[in-house]
Amino acid sequence: MNQTDLKHKLSAPFDFNEWKNILAQMFPKIDYLAKETSVDNNLVKNGGQIGVIHLNDGRSLGLFKFEVADNIHISRNRKGLREIAAKYVDQDIINGALVLYYSGIQTEYRLTFVSKQTVFDSEGNLSIKETAPKRYTFLLGESEPCTTAANRLIELINKNKRGSVYLDDVTEAFSVERLNKDFFNGYKTQYKRFVDTLTNTKQHRDYVKKLLGRLVFLQFLQKKGWMGVPASSTKWENGDKNYFAKLVEKYLDNNRLLSDVLEPLFFGVLNTKPEEREALFIKKGWNISLLTEFEGIPYLNGGLFEPDNIDNLTIDFPYSYFKELMDFFAIYNFTIDENDPEDSEVGIDPEMLGHIFENLLEDNKDKGAFYTPKEIVQYMCRQSVIQYLKTHEPSEQYAEAIEQLINDGIVNPILQNKNIAIRFTRLLKEVKVCDPAIGSGAFPMGILYVLYHAIHHLHSHAEPHGNFNSTQTKRDIIQNNIFGVDIEQGAVDIARLRFWLALVVDAEEPQPLPNLDYKITCGNSLLSRYPIDAPIENVFVEYNKGKKENEKMTLAKYKELVSAVSYTHLTLPTILRV
């Protein structure tokens, strides 16, 4: 079996008989159980452990297969899959496991590697402590590219032919870090091609960064299915997940693709409300017929698509540049659900927007801009919330319970009391977190997920009869708990977009979104107009000088204004309304 054959098999609907053949070529020995274990769970129709994989280093992997319930959306319901793994996989393995999740009614399925290793102490002796399970997943099936998966799994097949498949080889095959490195290296090559066409001034480099950043972001949006939504649809669904590649193909050899098609899309559609699009197209002299083609595309309230001075440049690139860029993107699986250090899809997640920005930021070392590994971000965010809770609930009886809740997602019996669960939930909802140098949003995104998971874990105890609303909880945290400042406008734009993607990941259609203009702003947090100990009521003294009484700003009026713009509706184009 070569890589092309394997990719074809991975892109087909799930067939376990086919997978038995693939697994036999990947691993030296597999013992299938005479009787498969079965589970009883509302998340699973049937399945359990079906065998044991033996590796050449003497280690073994459990082999599991689950047919998930119809309400589990395989391509984006990682939470439900985590719950299955936590209950039926994580506790029964030593070195790791391979898990196949599939559905009889969905085209996608998942191959997940669960890594769980014993820890050695400083003297090299085996410790009884084991690492927390980490999950790495390939999303496969008819609508997925499967290029990376085929490339990685063929490596295991070739190593098996040489008789040397070790646990480290399996871990490497599912490595997200390696994928990110490969993607970024390829991205830099694409970036350099565009820049080299111009004069390589800072202005032109900034232009290319923003152009490519816009196109990367739209890869995530089309993955959600919100690009090219059919005109007959009354909901945001069934969009074309290959929309941009087809758009570029449609305008074959058009060397004015940027001016004629992409700029009207960026500024006239993505940055303009549906009812205002036609007037803007006429004013700009854009091809009015494009409006019909772009009807199934939402209006975004993010700064990435607002035209700025750099967009006044008259620039075009050869058609081949955009065609090769789309071909490059097509190699990778884009996932809008941000990866967690302990649960990662082997694909490009929204953090890559920040990674690209930080690595292409000129003089980034002089500006103090460095990429912080996600594990460190997660640790710092968890510790910050732990210390906050311990400060407000200093009783020693809660110390261990707080750490278990934030670090492990375990609700200690002491926190299961309804009144106590309500009290801790209120504390989590009231905390204010400000990052004075937000960069592309790594730390605030980390805080978002720490608060979200803690509130989620406490919910069944604080509100035993209430339904947990995932999207609303995230929206409330973003709106009420998180603030940030950065001197780079590009960083602010990326951070806002990452929060936006965090909301849409669970949404069935665009909902009113928080307006983040007053939450994540561009500015220099090292400079201040006000003494650090000045009463907050005095911050408008300078602003109010010389103004009439009815023009003066007060803290109450400011809060009222912020509240008035706190939500901005994303509306369906007129043709999509019932």
Sequence positions of predicted segments:
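Preference for the N-terminal adenyl/adenosyl cofactor-binding alpha/beta module
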Residues: N2-I22, K29-I30, K35-I53, N71, ...
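Short, polar/flexible loop-turn hinges at active-site or ligand-entry regions and domain interfaces
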Residues: F174, N200-K202, W226-G228, K365-K367, ...
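Conserved SAM-binding loop
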Residues: A495
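Short, exposed interaction patches on small structured surface elements
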Residues: S525-Y567
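Conserved small/polar residues in nucleotide/adenosyl-binding loops
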Residues: T568-T574
